[in-house]
């Protein structure tokens, strides 16, 4: 059985499943509730995604070192072809495999076409949008997505975010999962009886959400986009 005393975020995995860490162990969870123990984390090691861990400012993929010198990293997204984007305070060692974003806090999502990324911003209604060029440079960061908030502008994004293949952004917040369109406007809020959503993972057409030590799953018509499966175009919403 799964240990649901989860530390950190939940993350998408292959075949519509998700992974998470609890008490230094990494679990794989299916939509039908089947749970499998995958591995044990080392002391000081943090799960950052499927097969991704961070320890002593060093990023690992399936136990192999990817890059070091990543100080204050809060989120990592794996792209295709061995590339990564990391939200960190700074990068002290240049690495061609990892593009570092220093604007924003806590959470990171990559647009399906790889043209921009979105990061969290504390004590505001907004999320930050940053253009990514083909060389991995981060350009022109600015507040863009506007979230609903009942705390008078003191919202800190509760957990992580994900795009679907239509380019809509799903954000875990105290009000529930807020779904924003291409123009940065929230078009829907998926609320849960358990209250605030602390984290989410969009894997295939299954949307997983964590509320404290409870995990809910909903089968969606939309399909989550996992950045490591490659860039894809999507139709403009105007």
Give residue spans per PLM region:
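Short coil turn/linker residues within repeat-based beta-strand modules
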Residues: 32-34, 94, 124, 134, ...
């Amino acid at each position: 059985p799964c240990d649901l005393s989860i530390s950190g975020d939940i993350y998408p995995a292959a075949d519509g499943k998700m992974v998470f860490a609890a008490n230094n162990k990494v679990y794989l969870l299916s939509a039908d509730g089947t749970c499998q123990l995958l591995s044990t984390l080392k002391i000081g090691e943090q799960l950052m995604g499927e097969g991704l861990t961070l320890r002593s400012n060093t990023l690992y993929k399936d136990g192999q070192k990817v890059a070091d010198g990543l100080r204050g990293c809060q989120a990592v997204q794996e792209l295709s072809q061995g590339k990564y984007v990391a939200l960190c305070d700074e990068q002290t060692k240049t690495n061609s495999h990892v593009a570092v974003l220093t604007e924003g806090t806590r959470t990171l999502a990559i647009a399906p076409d790889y043209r921009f990324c979105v990061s969290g911003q504390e004590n505001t209604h907004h999320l930050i949008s940053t253009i990514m060029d083909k060389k991995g440079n981060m350009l022109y960061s600015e507040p863009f997505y506007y979230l609903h908030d009942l705390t008078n502008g003191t919202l800190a994004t509760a957990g992580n975010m994900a795009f679907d293949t239509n380019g809509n952004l799903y954000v875990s917040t105290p009000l529930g999962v807020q779904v924003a369109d291409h123009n940065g406007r929230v078009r829907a809020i998926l609320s849960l009886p358990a209250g605030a959503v602390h984290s989410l993972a969009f894997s295939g057409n299954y949307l997983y959400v964590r509320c404290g030590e409870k995990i809910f799953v909903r089968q969606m018509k939309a399909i989550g986009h996992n950045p490591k499966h490659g860039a894809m175009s999507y139709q403009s919403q105007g």
